Amino acid sequence: MSILHATILTVFPEMFPGTLGHSLAGQALNKNIWSYDVINIRDFGLTKHKNIDDEAYGGGNGLIMRPDVLGSSIDHALALNPNAEMYYPSPRGRVFTQSFAKEMLKNKNLIFLCGRYEGIDERVIEEYNVKEISVGDYILSGGEIPTLTILDCLIRLLPGVLMNQNTLSSESFEEDGEFKGGLECSLYTRPEIWRNRAVPSVLLSGNHRLINEWKKAQSHMITKLRRPELLKDL
């Protein structure tokens, strides 16, 4: 079985593995279910100051990461991971979803280009057929946090990461799962009564048919209230 391997291009290599070195992802890393290497873009910087950015042609605010610097670092990454698919976290990109995550895993070799400043030179995207990917309609300081987020999602989907792989079928957004791509139902555990709030009686009934019906109804109601666009295909 091929493992997931991620090559990460960044100016902050110390940010990795970060949260991915803990909990499920960290355990999976220790089991060699996935692996990673980090390339410091600044190692390919220009002059003794290791410059990696410059002013934008046409004016505008902020600095742009230079294509010659990025090109050298990407060439190095491709030498290490030659068959990899390359992704650039960007607000212009295709929105990352659970189904997109499964699509990404068709290639277990991935490169993530973490941008900084105002962004990267467009010619880099064109030259290397880089796929832009967005984690939402908001702006972050760089691509490192989106990369950590995307990798966390991908790692959870790998066989052997979750103790019970069936857990995936009862989670939000799983199109083939219990809630058909909608949001997960409300969850309860002990104590049965907490601060005068009781667990719904149906969950204590032992009647699996009624419990399943309640869960599906809850999922539909929550999805309709909070993410109605997810119901269009249900």
UniProtKB/Swiss-Prot annotation:
GO terms (BP aspect): tRNA N1-guanine methylation
**What is the protein name for this chain?**
tRNA (guanine-N(1)-)-methyltransferase
Report whether S-adenosyl-L-methionine shows up as a keyword of the record.
yes
EC numbers listed for it are 2.1.1.228
Entry similarity comment: Belongs to the RNA methyltransferase TrmD family.
State the function annotated in the UniProt record. Specifically methylates guanosine-37 in various tRNAs.
Q: Molecular function (GO) terms listed? A: tRNA (guanine(37)-N1)-methyltransferase activity
Sorted alphabetically, the keyword list is: Cytoplasm, Methyltransferase, S-adenosyl-L-methionine, Transferase, tRNA processing
PANTHER family with a match to the protein in the record? TRNA (GUANINE-N(1)-)-METHYLTRANSFERASE
* GO cellular component terms, A-Z: cytosol
Record localization? Cytoplasm
What does the subunit comment say?
Homodimer.
Q: Where does S-adenosyl-L-methionine bind?
A: G115, V135, G136, D137, Y138, I139, L140
Q: Which InterPro entries match?
A: Alpha/beta_knot_MTases, tRNA_m1G_MeTrfase_C_sf, tRNA_m1G_MeTrfase_TrmD, tRNA_m1G_MTases_N, tRNA_MeTrfase_TRMD/TRM10
UniProt organism field: Rickettsia rickettsii (strain Sheila Smith)
Q: Which reaction does it catalyse?
A: guanosine(37) in tRNA + S-adenosyl-L-methionine = N(1)-methylguanosine(37) in tRNA + S-adenosyl-L-homocysteine + H(+)
Give the main EC class: transferase
Disulfide bonds, paired cysteine numbers: none
